[in-house]
Amino acid sequence: MNVPLPAGAGDVAYEKVADEISRPFVENYKPQMIFVSVGFDAHWNDPITTLGLSTAGYLTLARKVVQLAEEHCEGKIVFVLEGGYDPRNVANGAEAVFIAETGKGEAEASDPNPRKEPDCASRIQEVRRWHGF
């Protein structure tokens, strides 16, 4: 499911999307397996991005989707690497996903977004209405 977020959307917005859109969608749809297309180009420090995720944000999101898979489809989940144009961000993000998937290790990178995140509440509510949540 794609959710159109404005430039600068980061950890707060993505976590709200996970909680307020992805969770109800999965609970309603009842998938047999979850596929996640992971693009690390949404990292705030990616050279071509206008989004604002941090590595900690990727870890939080990955943990949430792993939990959804455990709750709704016997833990069946596949992560597929898509994009990311800064090698350090890709490595740190992939490590975060691995930690979330295996439950082993701790993320070392601490790279909070230094920019102010826009309020995305109205966009999230709009998408919820589109999907009847």
What spans do the regions from the language model cover?
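A general "terminal functional-core" signal
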Residues: 1-133
